[in-house]
Amino acid sequence: MRTRYRMERRALLTGGTALALTAVAGARVPLAQTLDKVSFQTNWRAQAEHGGYYQAVAAGIYRRHGIECEIRMGGPQQNPAQLLLAGRVDFIMSNGFQALNYVREGLPFLTVGAIMQKDPQVLMTHEGNGINSFEDMKGRPILIGASGRVTYWPFLKAKFGFTDEQIRPYTFNVGPFLADRMAIQQGFISSEPFAAQQAGARPRVFLIADAGYQNYQTTIDVSQRMVNEKKDLVQRFVNATIEGWSAYMKGQDVAGANAAIKRDNPEMDDAKIAYAVQVMNQAGIVASGDALTMGIGAMTEARWKSFYEGMRDVGRYPAGLDYAKAYSLEFVNKRVGLA
C-alpha cells in the first residue's frame, strides 16, 4: 500500500506540498491573541497514524496553546531531517533511529516526545499455514524493504537467528503476499493487514515491538537552537500535540480531523481510518508502557539506553556514542492528557 508513513519508504514528503489546516469554528482564542506560527513536517501522506496532529489543528487545541500550526504532509521525494537541517520547518515527525543518527553525525537536533510507544512494524503471514511465531519464520523467505534491513532486521537476526539469505525484495504492495500462502512480508499493523483482508486473505500479524524491539516511533524532533531559545513554545507544542492524540485515540469529536486527513490524502477513506485507530488501540501503539502512567509522548532514559545498546550490539551504531544527546525528557512525562 502507499498510504503509510515512515522513514522506511526512502524518506518522505511530497515536493513542496504544504497544507495549512484551519481550526474549527468556536475555538476559544481571543481575537487579539498573537499566535506563534510553526510548521510541522510529517514523514508520509496523511493518515490515521498522524491523526493526533490533525486533531490538535482541527479542534483548535494548538490555537488554545497560542500556536498556529501548519501541517506539511510527507511523501516519497523529500526527507524531513534534511528540511529541519535547512531550517525550512520547525518540527518534524521521526523515530528513534533518526535521533541517534543526529548524534552520530554531529547534528544539533533531538527528540522531545515519542507519540508511539510501540513501533507499528510487523511481519505478517497467512492464517493456518503453520507459521505461528517469529521462531517459525527462521529460514523462510521474508519480503523486506531497504530501510527495514538496517532497522528492525538486525534485531530479528540477533533475537531469532534470521539470516540475510532469507531476505526477498519488498515492493510495497500485497500482491506477492496474496499469491503465496506461505509468504511472509513486512508491513505496518495499521495498513498492510487491512489491504490483505480487503483482498480476501486472512493475515496473521506479528508485532515486532512485542518481541522486544524498542524503537520509538512518530517522534517530535526539533533543533537544539529552538529548545534553547523558545523553550516555552516547544513545551506548548508538545502539550497541545499530546492533547490532540489523547482526544483522537479516544474518538472524541474527530470528524474534523478525519475530514482533513481525507482532504489531504484522497487515498484515505473512513474504513481505513477506522481500522487503523482500532488496531492501534488494541495493540497499544500509542497508549501503553510508560504512556499509561506518564502520558502520551512519554520517554525514559532507561529505554533510550536499552535501545541504543541493542542497536550497538548488532553493529548499527558505534560503541561510545553519547546517545543521551539524542533526546530531552524535559517536555514529556507530565501526565498531560491523562484523566
Q: What are these model-predicted stretches?
A:
Residues 97-98, 172-267:
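Pocket-lining segment of extracytoplasmic ligand-binding domains
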Residues 70, 78-79, 210-211, 274-281, ...:
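Short linear loop/turn motifs
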Residues 1-7, 11, 15-25:
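N-terminal secretory signal peptides
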Residues 31-187, 206-207, 214:
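Short, glycine-/small- and polar/acidic-enriched structural segments
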Residues 301-339:
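Conserved C-terminal helix/tail region of periplasmic/extracytoplasmic solute-binding proteins
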Residues 228-314:
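Secondary-structure end/capping motifs
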Residues 1-6, 31-33, 339:
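Basic/polar N-terminal segments that are highly enriched at the extreme N-terminus
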Residues 162-167, 265-278, 317-325:
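Short, surface-exposed acidic
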